[in-house]
Amino acid sequence: RSSDLPVVEIGKVVVEAKNITVNNRFGVKKVDGISFEIREGEVLGVAGVEGSGQTELIEALTGLDKIESGEFILNGKNLTNLKGLNQSVEKIAHIPEDRHKRAAIAEFDISENFALGQHGNRYKKGLGLLNFDKILSEAKKYIEKYDVRPIDPKLIFGKLSGGNQQKIIVARELEKENIFIIAAQPTRGVDIGAIEFIHKMILEEKKKGKAIMVVSSELTEILNLSDRIAVMCAGKISGILNREEATEEKIGILMAGGKISE
């Protein structure tokens, strides 16, 4: 397994989570004092039974939820509860776990979905207007690079297969300027061909020295992509394993809140 990962020199610390606590809207603690680091060129996998706090952690790191206590530092800058955290400005790429709710508009066409969330800088042409020619030409480029079928950028997003929809979201997030990539359930509900392709594109970003967090309920996905694996249980990290020592059995024990004997 480890031979499949590209050999990448792990660089400086990019992401620092320090004792982060997040409550849900009812005041119930969902993330309970979590700490981890992610370095350049490193993939940290986050495993756990769904509902262990992964969703709330991601929402806190992307500015969608409030960090109750603790700190989130990205590239030396403290982003904890930054008012109006702009993911593009802070160079955070976010592949959300629910593409229909958080990542795309089904009634928009492919090119319009490529431009979502990027209107503030990349596609402006003065007077606050969008450069639709640029949006269309970039959409064509990414459709080819990410092997999206059919190849027409004016097709309605909602009419595409799940795999092609997900490739568009992955393309949009990976192609924008970023230093930290959060990939949440990146291959949920897609076919095997799309799974392999999306994994390949995530590992290409690792080669470029990006700090990457992959959150998945699929253990094979976590094992195939990660350098280290943080296992969550009931809002806490129950253990962090290096990929060389990680097995499905060990991860399963930690997911249930157990301890691994040395």
Stretch-by-stretch model annotation:
Residues 1-262:
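Glycine-rich phosphate-binding loops of nucleotide-dependent enzymes
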